[in-house]
Amino acid sequence: MSRQPDLFRDGLAGGWKVLGAELGPVPEQLRCDVVIVGSGAGGGISAELLARAGFDVIVLEDGPLKTSRDFHQRESEAYPTLYQEATARKTTDKGIGILQGRCV
């Protein structure tokens, strides 16, 4: 069985700077060209394209940084970490569940 690539582990090994939480304190001041709030589908690709174009990009995310070795194919472990309110977030009338991510 082939091993899945771990883009985050490779990025960290290649010099990505990750700050906050268990990785250490965030400095009081940071300088960059662009700040992306949220690493979802739009935020992640925007950050990549801007970085490739030469911009200094910071991505702010609510939850933790997860790599492929953090996943064990168990929903009961994944949902509380990966989604806001452990997938319990719903519309006001509780008619629709909202799966809103909270990690990189």
Outline where the language-model segments fall.
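N-terminal glycine-rich phosphate/pyrophosphate-binding loop and immediately adjacent elements
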Residues: 3-104
